[in-house]
């Protein structure tokens, strides 16, 4: 079980690649290590499936909490459903590697990345992407690789490769670039309103590092004596495609050039043309080659018709510069936007529509206890801003069972979440947990960017003081030979038949989120730069339309949103506020009908639907944590009487005792002769003993309202 280990130097670090030791029955496996982070990646190929017309590729990213020396917190104490960040890592592997398999492949493929050990200085996700490529090469699966990925951060004016978790938190940029020797195949980024030129430079910086990792992969398989399997497309029977080209080209061209057709009308006419072709084929002799081919493969006619439509639409864009809806290449579809479309029981709402894509977003304000706890390998264990994306079947006119969110929904929600994070107020000044839900009511392309726009409107409608509004647009690409056309605001058919889906979100100042997926094996940096640059005027146009609906965050929140106060106390006094067994804080919440959260740093957050109740709770806590000095005067209320004295509440939640000898300058036989429960008295702090107990006195303290003035008045709500 010795295996083969190869060490490579990359950006001043050592990366170790161990092959032929682990998972011997997998098609290919590699343990890729950097620092104390180790990821085992396997690639396995099974026999092909009959009757399918897609590549059955599955990518899995498995986090094991033993990798961080932890035991799962679930009842069964084992990992269950993958956490959200693991799902996003699955997509990070899938998106760059899927276009590198030949489109005609029908074999079952599975790539599994298992995090075996994690080092906070080396996030494992980009190692898993590079490992997936090497494992595929080792499995001798036909593949247009190698492919590799790196993460790029920006600290000050310097780009850094593969930053640590802590560096990512401080970085103005969190960018993942994946590519082949031919070009970039995937980009994923979150940024602090980064200018377009800086983003382009960062992608270029990352791609140069990707090329180095590709070289190391080639050297590794060469040392192992493995020859890469280059995909060889099998010979195709062109009988049916040639027949359709002859019979349908004119009719399809007429439909694609009717720019006033709606999506439904265009789809209906194309379906009609396909149905007529099917009827014509059915009328052919049984011995005819076309009829025989269609009869032997139930999906051949549909796939051939789709391929013909795709090539004609692409040719129309490249040659004529016209899209199926008549727009120019850089034109955005008609936009409408509205804020506050739902009753104020919903804290904030926004409706955004672009063409036939319509998204309704809602914003809900919560308390710190509503934050999402993340039970995964990432050191960051809480989320205070959540974005959830829902894509019901009716949004595309279909029927299917309603199930829990899939990887696509989770990925789209994360992208929209990342786009808004840079403009949200810090929790110190706006101590709310925020949840935005985007309901896709109608889909015809770019629903994730519609969710970004709807989220902005919903947050502003909820009174969240965001730093700037955020909008987004999806860019597309058609590449035919040396001819390349970049499309602004692609709709569904252009996404489906095009070569790229490039989503860019940001403010007027710069980019906050970016995601690029390819259907080709690489894109030149020049074209990426054109797409990023072309997205800016589209984004500014969309922002202008959104601001016509609501130009700034509302000054007031929904009356049904919780009112919150945030203040700081001495961390050493947190125990005083909580009390034995939590009795003190429980008593405050019950008395004031509020929700109280205390952080280890001493930040206290009080939430209530009644502002006065929140203020009362604040006064009680401040009273509990206020340091009392000897000689101070207070107005207070007698709360208890005992034979040797009386207790007086001098601050909310804080009592002192007047010994019977301190009730008067004269001898007092019975405490009740001077004070009774409920009496309001002015007292002076006589001393604070070594156990922190406050001893009070009435002796020499005027009770007629004359000076000296008390330091603190009675608690709020008392009389």
UniProtKB/Swiss-Prot annotation:
Enzyme class: transferase
Reactions the enzyme catalyzes: RNA(n+1) + phosphate = RNA(n) + a ribonucleoside 5'-diphosphate
Family: Belongs to the polyribonucleotide nucleotidyltransferase family.
Molecular function GO labels: 3'-5'-RNA exonuclease activity; magnesium ion binding; polyribonucleotide nucleotidyltransferase activity; RNA binding
Function statement: Involved in mRNA degradation. Catalyzes the phosphorolysis of single-stranded polyribonucleotides processively in the 3'- to 5'-direction.
Protein name as it appears in the record: Polyribonucleotide nucleotidyltransferase
Gene name linked to the record: pnp
Any single GO BP term: RNA processing
Domain KH intervals: 562-621
Entry-linked SMART domains: KH, S1
Subcellular location as annotated: Cytoplasm
């Amino acid at each position: 079980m010795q295996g083969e280990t190869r060490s490579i130097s990359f950006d001043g670090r050592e990366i170790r690649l161990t092959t032929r030791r682990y998972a011997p029955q997998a098609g290919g496996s590699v343990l890729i290590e950097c620092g104390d982070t180790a990821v085992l990646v396997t690639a396995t190929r099974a026999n092909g499936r009959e009757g399918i017309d897609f590549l059955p590729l599955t990518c899995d990213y498995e986090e094991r909490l033993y990798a961080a020396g932890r035991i799962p917190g679930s009842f069964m104490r084992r990992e269950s459903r993958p956490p959200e960040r693991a799902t996003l890592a699955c997509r990070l592997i899938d998106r760059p590697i899927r276009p590198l398999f030949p489109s005609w492949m029908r074999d079952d493929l599975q790539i599994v990345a298992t995090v075996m050990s994690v080092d906070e200085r080396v996030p494992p996700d980009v190692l898993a992407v590079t490992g997936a490529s090497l494992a595929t090469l080792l499995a001798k699966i036909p593949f247009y690789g190698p492919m590799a990925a790196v993460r790029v951060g920006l600290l000050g004016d310097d780009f850094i490769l593969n930053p640590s978790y802590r560096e990512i938190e401080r970085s103005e940029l969190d960018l993942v670039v994946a590519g082949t020797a031919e070009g970039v195949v995937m980009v994923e980024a979150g940024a602090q309103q980064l200018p377009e030129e800086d983003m382009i430079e960062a992608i270029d910086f990352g791609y140069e590092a990707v090329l180095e990792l590709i070289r190391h992969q080639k050297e590794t398989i060469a040392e192992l004596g493995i020859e890469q399997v280059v995909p060889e497309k099998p010979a195709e029977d062109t009988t049916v495609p040639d027949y359709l080209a002859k019979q349908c080209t004119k009719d399809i061209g007429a439909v694609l050039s009717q720019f006033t057709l709606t999506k439904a009308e265009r789809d209906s006419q194309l379906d009609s043309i396909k149905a007529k072709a099917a009827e014509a084929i059915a009328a052919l002799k049984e011995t005819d080659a076309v009829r025989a081919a269609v009869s032997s493969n139930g999906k051949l006619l549909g796939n051939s018709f789709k391929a013909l439509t795709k090539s004609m639409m692409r040719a129309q864009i490249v040659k004529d510069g016209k899209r199926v809806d008549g727009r120019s290449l850089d034109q955005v579809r008609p936009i409408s936007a509205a804020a506050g479309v739902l009753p104020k029981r919903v804290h904030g709402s926004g409706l955004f529509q672009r063409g036939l894509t319509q998204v309704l977003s809602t914003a809900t304000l919560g308390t710190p206890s509503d934050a999402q706890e993340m039970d995964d390998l990432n050191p960051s264990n809480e989320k205070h801003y959540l974005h959830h994306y829902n894509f019901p079947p009716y949004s595309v006119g279909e029927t299917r069972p309603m199930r829990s969110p899939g990887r696509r929904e989770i990925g789209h929600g994360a992208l929209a979440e990342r786009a808004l994070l840079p403009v949200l107020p810090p929790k110190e000044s706006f101590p709310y947990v925020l949840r935005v839900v985007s309901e896709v009511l109608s889909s015809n392309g770019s629903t994730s960017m519609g969710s970004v726009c709807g989220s902005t409107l919903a947050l502003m409608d909820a009174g969240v003081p965001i730093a700037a509004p955020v909008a987004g647009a999806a860019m597309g690409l058609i590449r035919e030979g040396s001819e390349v056309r970049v499309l602004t605001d692609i709709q569904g058919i252009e996404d489906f038949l095009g070569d790229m889906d490039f989503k860019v979100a940001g403010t007027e100042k710069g980019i906050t989120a970016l995601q690029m997926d390819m259907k080709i094996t690489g894109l030149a940096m020049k074209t990426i730069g054109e797409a990023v640059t072309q997205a800016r005027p589209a984004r500014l146009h969309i922002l202008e339309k959104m601001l016509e609906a609501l130009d700034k965050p509302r000054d007031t929140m929904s009356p049904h949103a919780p009112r919150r106060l945030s203040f700081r106390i001495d961390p050493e006094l947190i125990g005083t506020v909580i009390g034995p067994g939590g009795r003190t804080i429980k008593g405050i919440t019950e008395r004031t009908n509020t929700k109280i959260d205390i952080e280890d740093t001493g930040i206290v957050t009080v939430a209530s639907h009644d502002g006065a109740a929140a203020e009362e709770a604040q006064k009680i806590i401040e009273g509990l944590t206020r340091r009392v000095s000897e000689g101070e005067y207070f107005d207070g209320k007698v709360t208890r009487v005992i034979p040797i004295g009386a207790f007086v509440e001098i601050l909310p939640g804080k009592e002192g005792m007047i010994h019977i000898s301190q009730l008067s300058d004269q001898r007092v036989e019975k405490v009740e002769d001077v004070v009774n429960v409920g009496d309001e008295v002015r007292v002076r702090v006589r001393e604070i003993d070594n156990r922190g107990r406050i001893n009070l006195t009435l002796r020499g303290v005027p009770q007629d309202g004359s000076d000296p003035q008390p330091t603190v008045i009675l608690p709020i709500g008392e009389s």
